């Protein structure tokens, strides 16, 4: 009985220790920021001058092979943050980003598409429930209150205040995010890399929100548009065959899944920013083709990739077959009448 009790106690102690160890591991996120491996290089002896024995003739010294002593200052070993800089998202057409010490800037074309940029930016902040300390619509500038970040690679989370503005710069519009103050655990952070990391994180969050706002608007407009879309055969810059649809990208994107379903192609995955659609094609019965009013293109069954291109007021559709090759010219031409009929019998889809 005493032995059994002792074993039970040992099991409980081991169990509690294991739980505590796992809990500690689950909250310690340093492994995501630190280099792993041997750190013996930190204690390696420094370089010393070569002392040749008396009478030995050494080769002529060549400066190209000198290993110079460099007194560098900065974090080393476990103190070195190995995370790469946050890169700006390229979700908005024609955009490019610039970074300075405490400022991240997104440059966009000063076009009708970006006419309502300021209103869209303020909507994104409201959708995120981010606190706004002050706002001046006349100058298109606002200042946020403290925004708390929640990153899985930080033990102690950061919070920051930002100034966000939209500025006209000639033929461009600039969306500017400026860091006013960054804190971690109540302590002010002045390290450039951290300020830039969270500045870029703020800019990317706004970019994602803008992309969603615009996608929702385009989807709403496309869902109200029905009717026949003109489809023609064409080719890309390298001469490979594709389909040309005389409708904007947003309209084609929303109506495409239903049209694909109509011709026996089931959508398995799609990405609007990349314009890619994955489908699985299965043969239809002759009665289905008769109902569609088109001739069977006789495509082999299997998985296809579809690349959707944005050509302003037109769109392109290029199919890549199961073996990784584009369709032949004959196969592509056969799909013209097929998709002409499919688009005429379908409207926008609810698939996202």
UniProtKB/Swiss-Prot annotation:
A Pfam cross-reference name: Lipoprotein_18
Main location: membrane
Bilayer topology term: Lipid-anchor
Subcellular location: Cell outer membrane
Residues with a covalently attached lipid (S-diacylglycerol cysteine): 25
GO cellular component terms, semicolon-separated: cell outer membrane
Record flagged with keyword Signal: yes
Signal peptide: 1-24
InterPro entries reported in the protein's UniProt record: BamC, BamC_C, NlpB/DapX
GO biological process: Gram-negative-bacterium-type cell outer membrane assembly; protein insertion into membrane
Key words, A-Z: Cell outer membrane, Lipoprotein, Membrane, Palmitate, Signal
Residues with lipidation of kind N-palmitoyl cysteine: 25
Purpose: Part of the outer membrane protein assembly complex, which is involved in assembly and insertion of beta-barrel proteins into the outer membrane.
Family of the protein in this entry: Belongs to the BamC family.
Subunit structure: Part of the Bam complex, which is composed of the outer membrane protein BamA, and four lipoproteins BamB, BamC, BamD and BamE.
The protein's name: Outer membrane protein assembly factor BamC
Species this chain originates from: Yersinia pestis
